[in-house]
Amino acid sequence: MQFICHLNLRSESADRQVLTADLVQAEIQRIHQLLGAGTIRHAWKKADAVAVVLVLDVADEAECRDVIGALPFSIAGILGVEIVSQVEPYADVFPERGAH
């Protein structure tokens, strides 16, 4: 199953003592690992905000939330989760792709 996740920094929690260069590097490294493993299919940074949109390919919503919960920003308590929604191919628009 694929899930779309909209994540941002919790501004009330993301102070300079928590949001260090090492933490940012750890977050980026973990996203790269999950992309390499195929758990994260796509990752986009919003142009107008400190936020990202991820597409995860996992067994269910619980696994999706577990993956997000294990991200360094989440562990540090600064990751806000706005949307977690299951998505599927739009077969009427792309019939050749069908169900994944």
What kind of feature is each model-predicted range?
Residues M1-H100:
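Conserved, structured core segments of small domains
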